[in-house]
Swiss-Prot record:
The record marks G51, G52 as: Cleavage. Gene3D superfamilies: Adenoviral Proteinase, Chain A. Belongs to the peptidase C5 family. One of its GO terms (biological process) is proteolysis. Requires DNA and protease cofactor for maximal activation. Inside nascent virions, becomes partially activated by binding to the viral DNA, allowing it to cleave the cofactor that binds to the protease and fully activates it. Actin, like the viral protease cofactor, seems to act as a cofactor in the cleavage of cytokeratin 18 and of actin itself. This is Protease. Interacts with protease cofactor pVI-C; this interaction is necessary for protease activation. Induction: Expressed in the late phase of the viral replicative cycle. Its EC number is 3.4.22.39. The gene is L3.
């Protein structure tokens, strides 16, 4: 089941991430059309009207003209298309076209922090947005928010170490949300159940 768009928006707002938050979108997210300020959003790789597929996060830092894409699974472009028929290049291009130079830098997550048995992709996106909000020039690593979780190459996800690491990540993520989001605390029982480990049987 995972998390709904409404739940994710409420979590983001309860974390105090108001300035620059564009909202929750499906695969038709238009990109960052105002590149004069930092902005961020959570985007589904599918059509939300038809149920949605997988949550990822996008952010744009206007100071460094950097476009960040955070996928909790760290899938390659090929895997994103194979699994979800999702491509982000249109979003990247529409953002670049708003700049006079037509030039922006892409930084994309390449490591997995979430287990494939989990439905917590939206919650991991909230963690990334908090990281970007407070550390917009280095949200992917090297700050106390995102460094709460550890990454592993996606090819190692189903290894014993990969399963152990990503399961630990989810436990730390839940503890962080309980500590920092009043909305998550209020709805913790249901949200933890809906995003739990072993929600999907992708490994034994």
């Amino acid at each position: 089941m995972g998390t709904s768009g409404a739940d994710l928006e409420n979590i983001v707002l309860s974390l105090g991430l108001h300035s620059g938050f564009l909202g929750i979108f499906d695969k038709h997210f238009p990109g960052f059309l105002n590149v004069n300020k930092p902005s961020f959003a959570i985007v589904n790789t599918g059509d939300i009207i038809q149920g949605g597929l997988h949550w990822i996060a996008f952010a744009f830092d206007n100071v460094t003209s950097t476009f960040f894409m955070f996928d909790p699974f760290g899938w390659s472009d090929m895997e994103l298309y194979r699994k979800y028929e999702f491509q982000y290049h249109r979003i990247l291009k529409s953002t670049a076209l708003t700049k006079p130079s037509r030039c922006i830098k892409l930084v994309k997550s390449k490591e997995a922090v979430q287990c494939t048995c989990s439905a917590a992709c939206g919650l991991f996106c909230c963690l990334f947005l908090a990281s970007f909000y407070h550390y917009p020039t280095f949200p992917m690593r090297g700050n106390p928010i995102i460094d709460l979780v550890d990454g592993i190459p996606p090819t190692k996800l189903h290894s014993s170490y990969g399963i152990y690491l990503t399961h630990c990540n989810q436990k730390k993520l839940i503890a962080w949300l309980l500590s920092n989001s009043a909305y998550f605390r209020k709805n913790a029982m249901l949200m933890i159940h809906n995003t739990r480990l072993y929600y999907l049987y992708t490994h034994l």
